[in-house]
Amino acid sequence: MTKPTFYITTPIYYPSDKLHIGHAYCTTIADTVARYHRAKGEDVFFLTGSDEHGLKIQRKATEMGVTPIQYVDEIIANFKLLWQRLNITNNDFIRTSEERHHKVVQSILQKIFEQGDIYKKNYEGWYCVPCESYWLERQLVDGKCPDCGRPVERMEEESYFFKLSKYQDRLLEYIETHPDFIQPVARRNEMINFIKQGLEDLSITRTTFDWGIPVPFDNKHVVYVWFDALLNYFTGIGYGSDPEKFNKYWPANLHLVGKEIVRFHTIIWPIMLMAMGEELPKQVYGHGWLVVEGDKMSKSKGNVIDPLALIDEFGADAIRYFLLREINLGSDGNFSRDALITRINADLANDLGNLLHRTVSMIEKYHGGVIHKTACSDPLDDELIALVNETVAKYQDAMDHMEINTAIKALWALISRANKYIDETGPWLLAKDPAKAARLETVMYNLAEVLRIVAILTSPYIPSTSPKIYTQLGLTAPEQFLLADTAWGGLPDGTKVQKGEPLYPRIEITESGETVIAATKKTAPAAKQAVKAEVKAEAKTESKAAATEEITIDDFMKIDLRVATILTAERVPKTDKLMKLEVRIGEEERTIVSGIAQHYTAEELIGRNVIVIANLKAAKLRGIESRGMLLAASDGEGKLVLADAPDIASGSKVK
């Protein structure tokens, strides 16, 4: 049976400067969509590339004393490196300087010229070099380019023109009768209004520079950048050289572009296709811009983010997840390091990473690492399984409509529900009752099965993480995760888990602004002295416990005692007594450092419901801010016993 095809493209990037996070944003979106459609079982072709011609490139190369091709070659190598580091799965990388592309452009230009849709005349107007665009006086904004706001240059030259105006009414009718052609809706409305103002014929050749594709019918001219660049979508799938491949993938399912170039893709490109007698792409989606800390990226502001450095610091999957989760695709999005670290710690480390760690740890502890598929159901199980099925449906609907962060939110709601399911079922209590052995097996299976399905659904977003989840569950990750495998019950009986390293260690920011892995954080000498002082103060307080001053009921009422669920536990490095705990108090998560490391192992603590003082003033212990204190009693031999609340919901007030 022939697979459905899905052809997706990014814009081809202009190699005029260094890489920035915006390049990573658009290509990560496209890769995610491509991976999703592969997971649906479709035959996907994913094209990206570089737009290498034009006056701007020629000027840059001249400034640097190199040829244009030498100038762009180095930048293109960095593009390809970035795509590799981000795990981008493009099928081809098209360069407009390649001979295969020159042939396509020249053959199409000749065809349109011969049918009378191209004519020559002298042209005078205002030219924006960075945008490679001519503008009329009335189109300028305060005398500057209406697209980028930069100064324009007055130019006059002989040029060939393409008859955009001839196809204006036909294009407008097409857009109005095909509501999905331009998305989101705001971009569609902008383009309709633009066309209704009247289209000018388009200058498509230049004589003022020679770094471009020669015009086949007049060797004094080279092809204007946009008429050249847009045809990459044909070259990449074999137009003129591989008819079978071209007919297989055209028309494109999705052109993903930044909002600033929607006009070129929804006016010039479809009119070119109409003139060629070719079908139009099914959709052009204009995503928003990525700003940094609320400001547009610029070298003058010093806020251009290097994506390669970011990947070195946080890892590709964390960057991909943040870009996809944090930003509504059709709107502008804000990048900040604080928001990135918050997402890593809250979503990836606490929610997903902790669910896997707790589940695998309990399967090892209670069942020797073996997953048992036992039928001992409970209404809680039915609710969880129903949510899984509902989530898969919501996820697919959102992804099909390019609502990527909506799909991720639905998926993380399932992850949160699975974490809550642990608290509700209390595996540590079931393990104490031999009569509930079958129930414990069912709970463990359900948690592992949720994680298996989560691994499949997250594979388009965090593709390096999904195989790690499979490995820890004792499964072999497939070469291609498939949505068809998300049906409940696919985890085989008898599977043996393989506990591994945390998926995402928590990230902390030092006082100097450096990021460190929480588990390996080193304490500076000054901080060590502060900790010693804090410990001495605590010891003095404890020694005077018997003679503590009496308090009133009003004093006692100031103490906010709450039930908290311990999410993660790890020893504080270079200490014997301190344990760093991540706890959930209702909907809030916080860190508490407690001196219980000699009395409980991390495994014994994870998943436990304990009582904490929730309104204790924050204090730093070993450089870690602790917000709260666990209640525990001490026996005659000095052993600490925690005040547990196993059957009370997290966040409940203790009175």
Language-model regions, residue ranges each:
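Structured secondary-structure scaffolds
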Residues: 2-48, 100-104, 130, 148, ...
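Helix-rich, typically C-terminal accessory recognition domains appended to large enzymatic cores
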Residues: 120, 326, 331, 339-377, ...
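Beta-strand segments within the central parallel beta-sheet cores of soluble alpha/beta enzyme folds
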Residues: 283-286, 470-471, 580
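Intrinsic disorder at enzyme termini
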Residues: 469-555
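Phosphate-backbone binding interfaces of nucleic-acid-interacting proteins
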Residues: 527-655
